UniProtKB/Swiss-Prot annotation:
Widely expressed, including in the pituitary, brain, large intestine, spleen, kidney, adrenal gland, ovary, testis, thymus, lung, epididymis, bone marrow, pancreatic islets and placenta. It comes from the Eukaryota. Induction: By TGFB1. Keywords: Chromatin regulator, DNA-binding, Nucleus, Phosphoprotein, Repressor, Transcription, Transcription regulation. One of its GO terms (molecular function) is transcription cis-regulatory region binding. Component of the MLL-HCF complex, at least composed of KMT2A/MLL1, MEN1, ASH2L, RBBP5, DPY30, WDR5, HCFC1 and HCFC2. Component of the menin-associated histone methyltransferase complex, at least composed of KMT2B/MLL4, MEN1, ASH2L, RBBP5, DPY30 and WDR5. Interacts with POLR2B. Interacts with POLR2A phosphorylated at 'Ser-5', but not with the unphosphorylated, nor 'Ser-2' phosphorylated POLR2A forms. Interacts with FANCD2 and DBF4. Interacts with SMAD3, but not with SMAD2, nor SMAD4. Directly interacts with NFKB1, NFKB2 and RELA. GO terms for cellular component: chromatin; chromosome, telomeric region; cleavage furrow; cytoplasm; cytosol; histone methyltransferase complex; MLL1 complex; MLL1/2 complex. This is Menin.
Length: 610
């Protein structure tokens, strides 16, 4: 069973528009042919990014010249996907799969695939790969790479399994995606899960197993169960997002960028990106590079990605906020970038840092120890230059420098680190070390003391009540940390605090944090209640509401440092010691009292040694 007559009429594919027409035709069907589309994309990517030299020893292969926008008068060459080439690759893949899997040995009751059948298909793909190759190399994600080079990356293996299952007529097997891993779901309602590929350094022994253990340990790799369960159209979107336009470390293929952008807009118009936050972020990045007339601007698309994560995935995804923060960072919008990074840390704080979460750790490490320090350093230089030469700087430059005079920017920075510290609590692996502390102190020092003191850090009433409870520190530790260690995958995520609020009357800016979880802020209603209660108490006059942002820390480390953070002078040694101490030691020995007592007693304990 090969290509259908309607599919054959669309060949040869001589241009980007021809490829888009093929995708549009397949997306109009109930079951778009994943094998065909992946082979076409892999073919085009190979000759536009991997091997751009026009081969002379392949008589069937030709290139279609067309005018190039840059330089003017130049030509660009598009590899012509001839029917004979694609049909031969298609026949080879389907014959290999159907010849290796005997469906009569795996009864499918009610048309539902069994775990043994899914495992068998994954074995066929797995055993067809080369025994030795660099698994993270570029351009090995498509079925073209699988057929012509017997190489696939991790997510490519999962996609190949789904494509093979479709070729076998197993319509209940679909791709499941987190932000750094892929597996399959199957069954009548997709309730069954199965590992089919490796992650990181490899986990071959997990193939065929469920992902329940990863969900239960609350690792980011499995998103606490809030992962994407794809249908066929979203699987097409996945292969489009997987297009790698890079020719080398410094050059991208303009043709592949244009192809990816047009295909993503096609999927967007058909509504197939609504449940795909990372695809929306990918499209927004492409629009920032080359805007499409009459289309939404990148900022709108970034916020659509965040809205998708909130609507369909309990706001448990990290990268929608990372995309937004990256956009603001590139455009030197310091305040908005810090806010988006703080929102990112607010999401991660409800996870446990596990061994296989190294990719998101690298992201946060780079942001905290490279991107933010350099962004604030640049802002400080602009602020200093503006003070020396007032009136000479552009408005945008002044706004970047003035971020260091904005207490809300400082509050966002604290909220970012509070989320990281909370992420570490209850995790089997420590997150913070002295490298983090060094750059935290450096970033804090970019803000003047009077700016830092405008941030009001308050304690929750629950902490005061906890200090009065008769049972000991061990019981409090167990109650605080127990749910993070013993949460079940079906439990809903814990409720979170409202987003960062400025003084009374201030509105929440666009791109603000998720309302259900944030690193501790006090809402206007709560502050109003506290103020009215204070007014009823016998006092000469009612206390005015705070002018600056009000912040409530969620992590024990940041609670212990709250007076150090807003002090006139920064005690770098104390902050470094506090930040790098193990959470288990801190939480077990701490006596809940005033913040200053907490900090000093903790520092003394470290000097003596444990």
């Amino acid at each position: 069973m090969g290509l259908k007559a309607a599919q054959k009429t669309l060949f040869p594919l001589r241009s980007i528009d021809d490829v888009v027409r093929l995708f549009a035709a397949e997306l109009g069907r109930e079951e778009p042919d994943l094998v065909l589309l992946s082979l076409v994309l892999g073919f085009v990517e190979h000759f536009l990014a991997v091997n751009r030299v026009i081969p002379t020893n392949v008589p069937e292969l030709t290139f279609q010249p067309s005018p190039a926008p840059d330089p003017p008068g130049g030509l660009t060459y598009f590899p012509v996907a001839d029917l004979s080439i694609i049909a031969a690759l298609y026949a080879r893949f389907t014959a290999q799969i159907r010849g290796a899997v005997d469906l009569s040995l795996y009864p499918r009751e009610g048309g539902v695939s069994s775990r043994e059948l899914v495992k068998k298909v994954s074995d066929v793909i797995w055993n067809s790969l080369s025994r030795s190759y660099f698994k993270d190399r570029a351009h090995i994600q498509s079925l073209f790479s699988f057929i012509t080079g017997t190489k696939l990356d991790s997510s490519g293996v999962a996609f190949a399994v789904v494509g093979a299952c479709q070729a076998l007529g197993l319509r209940d097997v679909h791709l499941a995606l987190s932000e750094d891993h892929a597996w399959v779901v199957f069954g009548s309602n997709g309730e069954q899960t199965a590992e089919v590929t490796w992650h990181g350094k490899g986990n071959e022994d997990r193939r065929g197993q469920t992902v329940n253990a990863g969900v239960a340990e609350r690792s980011w790799l499995y998103l606490k169960g809030s992962y994407m369960r794809c249908d066929r159209k979203m699987e097409v979107a996945f292969m489009v997002c997987a297009i790698n336009p890079s020719i080398d470390l410094h050059t991208d293929s303009l043709e592949l960028l244009q192809l990816q952008q047009k295909l993503l807009w096609l999927l967007y118009d058909l509504g197939h990106l609504e449940r795909y936050p990372m695809a929306l972020g990918n499209l927004a990045d492409l629009e920032e590079l080359e805007p499409t007339p009459g289309r939404p601007d990148p900022l709108t698309l970034y916020h659509k990605g965040i809205a998708s994560a909130k609507t369909y995935y309990q706001d448990e995804h990290i990268y929608p906020y990372m995309y937004l923060a990256g956009y603001h960072c590139r455009n030197r919008n310091v305040r908005e970038a810090l806010q988006a990074w703080a929102d990112t840390a607010t999401v991660i704080q409800d996870y446990n840092y596990c061994r296989e979460d190294e990719e998101i750790y690298k992201e946060f490490f780079e942001v905290a120890n490279d991107v933010i320090p350099n962004l604030l350093k640049e802002a400080a230089s602009l602020l200093e230059a503006g003070e020396e030469r007032p009136g000479e700087q552009a408005q945008g430059t002044q706004g970047q420098g003035s971020a260091l005079q904005d207490p809300e920017c400082f509050a966002h920075l604290l909220r970012f680190y509070d989320g990281i510290c909370k992420w570490e609590e209850g995790s089997p692996t420590p997150v913070l070390h002295v490298g983090w502390a060094t750059f935290l102190v450096q970033s804090l020092g970019r803000f003047e003391g009077q700016v830092r003191q405008k941030v009001h850090i308050v304690s929750r009433e629950a902490e005061a009540a906890e200090a009065e409870e008769p049972w000991g520190d061990e019981a409090r530790e167990g109650r605080r940390r127990g749910p993070r260690r013993e949460s079940k995958p079906e439990e809903p995520p814990p409720p979170k605090k409202p987003a960062l609020d400025k003084g009374p009357g201030s509105g929440q800016s666009a791109g603000s944090g998720p309302p259900r979880k944030t690193s501790g802020t006090v809402s206007g209603t709560a502050r109003g209640t506290e103020v009215s209660s204070a007014a009823q108490a016998p006092a000469p006059a009612a206390s005015p509401p705070p002018e600056g942002p009000v912040l409530t820390f969620q992590s024990e480390k940041m609670k212990g440092m709250k007076e150090l953070l807003v002090a006139t002078k920064i005690n770098s040694s104390a902050i470094k010691l506090q930040l790098t101490a193990q959470s288990q030691v801190q939480m077990k020995k701490q006596k809940v009292s005033t913040p200053s007592d907490y900090t000093l007693s903790f520092l003394k304990r470290q000097r003596k040694g444990l």
